Amino acid sequence: MVYSYTERKRIRKDFGKRPQVLDIPYLLAIQINSFKKFIEKDPEGLYGLEAAFKSIFPIKSYSGNAELKYISYRLGCSVFNVKECQTRGTTFSAPLRVILQLIIYCDESKHVVKNIKEQEVYMGEIPLMTDNGTFIINGTERVVVSQLHRSPGVFFDSDKGKTHSSGKVLYNARIIPYRGSWLDFEFDAKDHLFIRIDRRRKLPVTVLLKALNFSDGEILNIFFEKVNFFIRKKNLLMELIPKRLRGETALFDICENGITYIKKGRRITAKHIRNLENDKISQITVPFEYIIGKVSAKNYFDKKTEKPIITANTELTVDLMLNLFKSGYKSIETLFTNDLDHGSYISETLRIDSTTDKTSALIEIYRMMRPGEPPTKEAAENLFYNLFFSEDRYDLSSVGRMKFNKSLSINSSEGSSLLDKFDIIEVTKKLIDIRNGKGDVDDIDHLGNRRIRSVGEMAENQFRIGLVRVERAVKERLSLGDLDTIMPQDMINAKPISAAVKEFFGSSQLSQFMDQNNPLSEITHKRRISALGPGGLTRERAGFEVRDVHPTHYGRVCPIETPEGPNIGLINSLSVYARTNEYGFLETPYRCVLNGIVTNNIHYLSAIEEGKFIIAQANTNLDKNGYFINEFVTCRNKGESSLFNRNQVNYMDVSTQQIVSVGASLIPFLEHDDANRALMGANMQRQAVPTLMTEKPLIGTGMERAVAVDSGVTAVAKRGGIVQFLDSSKIIIKVNQEEIIKEKIGIDIYHLTKYVRSNQNTCINQTPCVCLNDVVERGDVLADGPSTDLGELALGQNMRIAFMPWNGYNFEDSMLVSEKVVHEDRFTTIHIQELACMSRDTKLGSEEITSDIPNVSETSLLKLDESGIVYIGAEVKGGDILVGKVTPKGETQLTPEEKLLRAIFGEKASDVKDSSLRVPNGVSGTVIDVEIFTRDGVKKDKRALEIEYMQIKEAKKDIYEELEIFKSSLKIQIEYFLKENNIEYDSLSELLKGNIKNLIFKNNNLNNIFEELINKFLRLKEEFEKKLEIKIKKITQGDDLAPGVLKIVKVYLAVKRQIQPGDKMAGRHGNKGVISKINPIEDMPYDENGVPVDMVLNPLGVPSRMNIGQILETHLGLAAKGIGNIIDNMLKNNKKIYKIKKFIQNAYNLGIGIRQKVELDHFSDKEIIKLANNLRKGMPIATPVFDGAQEIEIKELLKFSGNPESGQITLFDGQTGEKFDRPVTVGYMYMLKLNHLVDDKMHARSTGSYSLVTQQPLGGKAQFGGQRFGEMEVWALEAYGAAYSLQEMLTVKSDDVNGRTKMYKNIVDGSHLMEPGMPESFNVLLKEIRSLGINIELEENN
C-alpha cells in the first residue's frame, strides 16, 4: 500500500474485507461537469450556450428582407476574483460577447445579398462557478440544487380504479415534451377514448386523428382486424382464423365437410382450435343471424346511383344486408371485435364524434383551445400546427425521443424532436393494447422515468428564455428600422437576458443559500437532488409513492439521507458512486461477471438497463480467482431479491457502500442501526459546528479523507515538490523539475483562508499541516480547514463515555458532561458575526460616520477611533457602540432660551440624532476586522485611508516576496542548465552579478534555450508588475454601492462559545440530547486508575431506538484508545524504536482477512516516531459501511489493548467513592456539538409588540415575543384551582389592552393592583359570530 505524505503521519487501520475495485469518484462532479458543459463551446450545438444560440438564431424579419445570424461567442474574464466578490457583495461573473452578422437582402424572393455587417455584441453577464461548485451571487455563496423531474417521453398509467364509483380501472397515456403542450389520452367509464391538450376539456381521440387527415375508413383500417363474410342464398361463409374463436361460446354447430367440430352452446377451447387448425379449415358456414349487429369496415355504395348503402362503422341490420345483396355485392368486410382482447373502443368513439372531416375537426380543436373566439379555417390550421409540429413551440428533446421510442418498442433511439401522425397512432395503439390486457402500465416512480436536471441545463433554459424575449424585439426592429444605418449592436438589448439569468441564480427555488456549517454539509448540499421546484412537484400534492424508497434507488439515490418533516422523500442525496449519463438518468457502476468469474471491468448501468440483468451483492463471497464460492447467490433482478445459480449472474456490486450517500457512509456500524435513527444521524452530522481544536474520529469509515479533500476546505498540492516557505497565511512549494510544464513556473503559492465568516456564521480558518522542507506529492493535503484534522474530516471530539443513569441528570436523553470538557475547550467553537452600518443620503442631508455623537458619555466612545469606528481587537459586549453615526433631524420648534443659546454659541449639534451601530443585546466578542466601502466621488475618512494603505503594503509585500522566490528559482534553473550542458564556471553569484542577458555560449542552440529561460522570467516579472498595478487600482478605486448609500462600514465580531447546559449534542447514530448539567470533575464516575469519564449517557436511550451501532463504536473506541495509551507509555519510557515499530505493526495486523495490509518495513525511524506520536491519543480505525469490524475482531482488539473483552469496567461514584453495583459500559464515542446553541435560542420579554387583530403578544425570538400560555397550560392551572393566577395569565399578561396599560402604570407607581377587563380575543370571537349573522350583545347584570 502506497501512502501519501499526509497519510503516512497517521494511518487508519482498515477493517474492510472486500478489495476496493473502484476509487471513490470526485464528489462534486455532478455540479462541475454540468456547468462545464453549459459554458464550454460545443461544436455540434447540442449543449450549453451554443445550443441556446442555435435554437433562436438566425432571426428573420417579418418580411424576410433581413436576418440576424449568430457566428460565435466568447466569455470574458471576471473583474474581481471570488474573495473580492464576497467582500464587495458583487456577483462572480464573466461578460458574454457574441459575434453576430446582419445580412440584408436586395429583395425578399431571390435572396440576393445586398449587405453584410458583422459586430461583437455584449449580451450580459453569466455567473461563473467557483472551483468548489458554488456561485457567488451578490456576495453570498449559493448552490444550485439538481432537480429530479419526470423525463420527457410517453407514459402509460391507470387511475387504479379510484376515479369511477364502479371501481373500473381507467387507463391513460400522456406525451410529455421537454417544452410544449402536453397531450393526454384517456378512457372513460363507457370505454370511449378521449384526448386532452394541456389538461383542457376532452375531445374524442378520433377528432385528433381526423385533424391529422385520416378518414373514418382509414381510422378503422389502422386499428381493427377484419372479418370477411361471403353472401350465399341461405347462409353466409365466414373467413376463419381459428385463434379468434378462443373463449367464445358457439352460437350454432360448427360443422365442415360433414364433421361437427363444436356443438352449439359449448365453450370453445384450445383443443377445438387445434383440431380446426390441423384440418386446415379456413372457412365455415354461419347462419344469417350471426352477422346482424356486426360493424361494417368500409363504405358500400349503390353501383347505379352511387348513393351509400352502408357507411363505414355502421351496425348491420337485416334491411341493410338485403339492400347490399340486391345491389349485387357478394361479400362484406366487418370489424373483428370481442369482449376479451379486441375491444371496439375506436369504433364506439367514432360514433360519439360529431366532426366529419379535417376542417371540422380542426375547428373543434380550436374551439377547445380558444373558447369564445370565432374560428376561421386558417387560424385553426395554424393553431393545430403550432401545437405539436412547430420547432419553436414544441420540443420532445433527444431524451424524450429516446424514451418515446423505447416505450413503443421502436429500435432506433434517434428521430425528430417533433411529433408526427404515426407517433400519435402508435401511442393510441399501445394504449388500446393495454386496455385489451396486453402489456403493463409504467411505474412513474421508476428512476428510468425520472431524470436529473443539473445546473448547466437549468441555466441554459433560463438563458434561452432571455433570448426569446430579445428575439421578439429584434424582429420588430428588423421590420421597422432603417436597415442601411442599423448595426447588430443597436438591435440587441442585453437587459432581458441578464434579468432572466439573474432571476434564476438569485431567486429560483433551486438556487439556495449554501449550507456551510462544515465541509460535509457543503458537499451534501451540492449532491442534493430535489423533486421540488419549477416543473417539479409541490409538497402538498406529493403522495406517499413519490416519497417512498424505490428498488431502482439502489446505488443511485440514498435510501437513508432525506429530511424529516414535510419534505421527506422529496429531497434526496446522490449515492457515493452514482453519476448521470448523457440523457440525465442516474447510473451506478457494476463489475462484469463472465461465466461465474467476477472481473474488474466496470460498467455503469442506468435504471432502464439494470432491469434486464441479474446482479449479485457486494458482500458475496469470492475465492482468490474471483469465482463465486457458493453455488447459489443472493441477487437482485427486476427490483426483487432472490437466490440465483452462480452461472446466471451478469454483474456484481462494486462496493458495500454503493447504496448510501456520503453523509450516511460516514456512520460507522451503520449496518447495526435502525433506518430512522441512521437518517437522523446522517442529517445531524451536517449540523455539527467546527470545534476550536479539531480531533479526528477514532472510529471512522475510511470516507473521511475523501470528503475533506473533495469539499475544497483543505489546501491540496497541485504539483509535487518541496515546502520552501511557510507561515500561517501562505505556503510556497518549489515544484519538482519533471512536473514543470514548458511555459509555466516552478513555484506554487497557496494563500490560506484566515478567520473568514461562513454562511452559518461559523469560522473558516486554514492551518498548515506540513513543515519546512517537507517533500510533498501531488494531491497531498498541505493545510487543514475547518473540521478537518490531517486531511481527514473531523466534525466533533472523541469523548470517554459511560452508559449509566446518574442522579436523574440523564433523564429523557439529557447528557451529563464533565467540567474537564469545558476547561480543555473540547467543544469551544468560534462564531463570526458581521454587523454593517450604512451612511445614506437623506432628504434633510447626508448621514455622517463620526465619533462626535450627541448625548453619549466619554466611556462609551473609548473603543472608537477619531473616525468613529471601533478598533480591531476591542472586546465589546451588548449595547457598545461599534460605529458612531449621526442622522440629520427635522427642524424642531425652538424655545426662546435655545434660540438665545444658539445665537451666542453658533450651530449646536442638536439637529442630529444618534443612529450608531451597536452590538445587539446578548452578544459579546472581539472585533477581528473592519471593512469600509466608500462611494466613488465621496472623500475617504482617515480610517479608510489607513486600511487602504495597509492593503497596498500587504499586496506589495506579497508580490515582491513571490518575485524573490522566482528569482531564486531562476538561479536554480540556470545552475541546472549549466550543469546539464557541462559548462564550467567559477561561482554562480559572480556570474549573476553582471547583466545575465549578455551571457553568450559557443553553441548557438544553447544560446536559444538560455534566452528562452531568461525571457520566461522577464515575462513573469512583467506579469507580476501588471498584477500589482491592477491590485492597487482595485484597492484605491471607489466602490459601486446601492443608490443613496455613501459609505458602508462592516465590523466582524468573533464570539467564542463554550459548551453549556442547554446546548444540543449528538453522536453519529441519531442519539441526540441536550446537556443537563456541567458536573465538577471530582463528582464524575471514575475507574480503578482514577480516570473520570467525560460524559454520562442514559442506557435506556439505546434498546428502544435500536441504534446498536453506538455501543459497538464505544467498545471499539475503548480498544483504539487503549492501544494509543500503550504507545504513549512506550514513548514516555523511551522504549527502543524497533519495539515501538513491532507493537504498532502487530496492532495493524489484527483482524480477519483485512484488505489493507499496513507495511511499516519501509518507514524510516523518523517516520515511525512521527506516526507513534500521532497515535498517542488512540489508533484511528476505519470500519466501512456493511463491511465493518465483526464482534470477534472487536473482542480481539479489546484484549490486545489490555481491556476486558466485555467492554465493561468497574466504576466508582465520584461523590461517595463507593463502587457501583455492576460493571458499566465505558468507551470512546465521537460526539458532535450541533448548531442549536442555547445562546441563540434564549431570550426574555418585558413588554413588546402585539398582534394587530388579537392584541396578543407575538411569538419567537426574532419578534421579541413571549411564550404562549396554551390550552394545556390553562388546564394545569385549572387543575390546581389557581383561579387568580389563571385570570392574570388570560387578561393583563395577554390581551386585555386597558388592563395591561393600567397594570404597567401601577407597577411603576409601586402598587401591585390588577384590574382585569375584557380580553380582546373575546371581542374577536363576538365579531366572528356576528359575521355569521348571529348578534350577541353583552348586558351588565345589576
UniProtKB/Swiss-Prot annotation:
Family: Belongs to the RNA polymerase beta chain family.
Catalytic activity line of the entry: RNA(n) + a ribonucleoside 5'-triphosphate = RNA(n+1) + diphosphate
GO biological process: DNA-templated transcription
Keyword Protein transport: no
Record-given protein name: DNA-directed RNA polymerase subunit beta
GO MF term set: DNA binding; DNA-directed RNA polymerase activity; ribonucleoside binding
EC number, as in UniProt: 2.7.7.6
